[in-house]
Amino acid sequence: MIRLQAIRRSRVEKSDGKNAYWCVVSGSDLWLVDGQIPYGSAEQWDLPQEKAILVDRYQNSPVYWLNAADIEQDRPLTSLRELLGVDEALFLAASKAVQYGHMSQTIRFCPQCGGRNYLNHQQLAMQCHDCRTLHYPRIFPCIIVAVRKQQQILLAQHPRHRNGMYTVIAGFVEVGETLEQCVAREVLEETGIVVTNIRYFGSQPWAFPSSMMMAFLADYDTGELKPDYSELSDANWFGIENLPPVAPRGTIARALIEQTLADIAQDQA
């Protein structure tokens, strides 16, 4: 478990131009230099420091957010996924910048009255110029679950997955259901399997664009595996010795898979 330094804001904090991490974002993409978030001064990187907003700190250095549209010179943008291998605290800081950027780009107008929104200078939220309604970043709650059946783990492949990658079951939480109910429903709908012993594992913000992944472990109860091919390309039970390519390191899906395999290995010892 990582320890994040909390930032207490009474207002939006601007950059002083000193050495910092600079997250220049557009959608779920950001500017990387040699695969890393640029570090240094605003002057060094020719960035408009007056438009940079503090979103976090990493190793005692500030992490600033800038929208790519606010920079005169175009910078090559790369998916946030390219940072999955970096330290988790820095990845989460970059994720925060991406989500604030998404907020500023997608909540430009007030859904209450249609007025123009602007970035509120008391907190990181968009506010309507006319009716003054505050609009915070949208966060979509999702579950993700690793299901174990004796010495095997349930893994699924989605049509969007490349290189034959398999992962665990995931889905969005519906209105009026608990997280545990969502776990049971998603597994049943996508695979025909009924699960039991549902238990919390951890969470991960997932800025693609604005999800919060809440992870669970569960055990097989009953049912015959019948993949929903409108959602999945394949689903199957896999043992330690016959694993397919799985989700990359840095994802909570990979952490769930590794935990389940470790539990299986311990039981086999």
UniProtKB/Swiss-Prot annotation:
Residues that, per the record, bind Zn(2+): 110, 113, 128, 131
EC code: 3.6.1.-, 3.6.1.22
Cofactor note (record): Divalent metal cations. Mg(2+) or Mn(2+). Binds 1 zinc ion per subunit.
Co-factor(s): Mg(2+); Mn(2+); Zn(2+)
Positions with a binding annotation for substrate: 81, 136, 204-211, 253
Any one GO BP annotation for this protein: NADP catabolic process
GO cellular component, one term: cytosol
Binding residue positions for a divalent metal cation 2: 186
UniProt keywords, alphabetically: Hydrolase, Magnesium, Manganese, Metal-binding, NAD, Zinc
Residue ranges occupied by any Nudix hydrolase domain in the UniProt entry: 137-260
Binding of a divalent metal cation 3, residues: 186, 190, 231
Matching Gene3D superfamilies: 3.90.79.20, Nucleoside Triphosphate Pyrophosphohydrolase
Alphabetized GO MF terms: magnesium ion binding; manganese ion binding; NAD+ diphosphatase activity; NADH pyrophosphatase activity; RNA NAD-cap (NMN-forming) hydrolase activity; zinc ion binding
Location of the motif Nudix box: 171-192
Known catalytic reactions: a 5'-end NAD(+)-phospho-ribonucleoside in mRNA + H2O = a 5'-end phospho-adenosine-phospho-ribonucleoside in mRNA + beta-nicotinamide D-ribonucleotide + 2 H(+); NAD(+) + H2O = beta-nicotinamide D-ribonucleotide + AMP + 2 H(+); NADH + H2O = reduced beta-nicotinamide D-ribonucleotide + AMP + 2 H(+)
Source organism, top-level taxon: Bacteria
Binding site for a divalent metal cation 1: 170, 190, 231
Alphabetized NCBIfam families for the sequence: PRK00241.1 (NF001299)
Quaternary structure annotation from Swiss-Prot or TrEMBL: Homodimer.
Similarity section: Belongs to the Nudix hydrolase family. NudC subfamily.
Function: mRNA decapping enzyme that specifically removes the nicotinamide adenine dinucleotide (NAD) cap from a subset of mRNAs by hydrolyzing the diphosphate linkage to produce nicotinamide mononucleotide (NMN) and 5' monophosphate mRNA. The NAD-cap is present at the 5'-end of some mRNAs and stabilizes RNA against 5'-processing. Has preference for mRNAs with a 5'-end purine. Catalyzes the hydrolysis of a broad range of dinucleotide pyrophosphates.
Protein name (database record): NAD-capped RNA hydrolase NudC
